[in-house]
Amino acid sequence: MNKFLQSCVNGRTLKTGEAEKLMEMMMNGDMSQSEIGGILSVLAHRGETAEELAGFVKVMRARAQTSGGLADVVDTCGTGGDGISTFNISTAAAITASAAGAKVAKHGNRSVSSKSGSADVLEKLGVSIQATPESVKRSIEMKQMGFLFAPLFHSSMKHVAAARKELGFRTVFNLLGPLSNPLQVKRQVIGVYSFDKARLMASALEQFDVRHVMLVSARDGLDELSITAPTDIIELKNGERLEYSVSPEQFGFAEGSLKDIQVSSSEESALLIQNIFANKAPSSALHITALNAGAAIYTAGLANDLKEGTKTALEAIQNGDAKRQLERLKQKEEEMYA
């Protein structure tokens, strides 16, 4: 049995350096699928520590295919796995925030546990997800937003894919995705499926150089800022850590309806996003997009607080900027020069 697996089975937690070595072994293909499944199961059962998470993140970031970072870009990648089957809120928020002037490096993947992953819905919207590190950077520079399709940037993840799929439950990799943006962004909005996990991720992030990160977990179970219940937030900014909660009413929004933001496929998700940008969607869908885009605008440094960011996002949707931004994102690179 793998020595790290044996240690965890015996109740030990791993130091950061040990966690790094374990992740290297998984990423190198040096562990069997049963060993990988075993370690993921043990960690999920007892709960990961911030030290372990930080060690895993260091390796994931170091091995990511990247051409270097860009200043002041923001990511809206969340953990997923909330089981509520909403449309792709973080993707709609990313497009809206980029329409309002934020530089967005959206990290994401196809669906694993949800009805629609960010890559799935972007394809349905007509946005290319097959991008190299260089073309992502050019897209951010030219269009304010680029999409980093996780399998293209984290090729070593192929060694754990089978074990993850076979396990079928949330593992540490749900937490690692948002923490492993290949451009190593320092500004993020991270939706988390539980507030305990948000606290864990915040503690791990404090071991890295971050400028402004919001981790959000709603009390209705959403891994987003919600319009149907209060949302608990951890904010990391300038070396400080704040915890607080917000409610939809603080932003002038009436309590929304979950059924208005739920979908059964990536096609439905894409259609709802198009309707939001065309000002034809239910108010719940509009408001939840504005709220989450507002958080991205705020963490990008373009608003003084979440309320101002949300107001800016709402205007970007209502005045057609978000719809026009989606059309820009659909353009191929050569068409931008035509």
From Swiss-Prot:
The keyword DNA repair does not apply. It holds the Pfam family Glycos_transf_3. Keywords: Amino-acid biosynthesis, Aromatic amino acid biosynthesis, Glycosyltransferase, Magnesium, Metal-binding, Transferase, Tryptophan biosynthesis. Disulfide bonds: none annotated. GO terms for cellular component: cytosol. It catalyses: N-(5-phospho-beta-D-ribosyl)anthranilate + diphosphate = 5-phospho-alpha-D-ribose 1-diphosphate + anthranilate. InterPro entries: Anthranilate_Pribosyl_Tfrase, Glycosyl_Trfase_fam3, Glycosyl_Trfase_fam3_N_dom, Glycosyl_Trfase_fam3_N_dom_sf, Nuc_phospho_transferase. Transmembrane segments: none annotated. Binds 2 magnesium ions per monomer. Pathway: Amino-acid biosynthesis; L-tryptophan biosynthesis; L-tryptophan from chorismate: step 2/5. Anthranilate 1 binds at G78, N109. Its EC number is 2.4.2.18. Its cofactor is Mg(2+). GO terms for biological process: L-tryptophan biosynthetic process. 5-phospho-alpha-D-ribose 1-diphosphate binds at residues 78, 81-82, 86, 88-91, 106-114, 118. Mg(2+) 1 binds at S90, E224. GO terms for molecular function: anthranilate phosphoribosyltransferase activity; magnesium ion binding. Anthranilate 2 binds at R164. Mg(2+) 2 binds at D223, E224. Belongs to the anthranilate phosphoribosyltransferase family. Catalyzes the transfer of the phosphoribosyl group of 5-phosphorylribose-1-pyrophosphate (PRPP) to anthranilate to yield N-(5'-phosphoribosyl)-anthranilate (PRA). Homodimer. This is Anthranilate phosphoribosyltransferase. The gene is trpD.
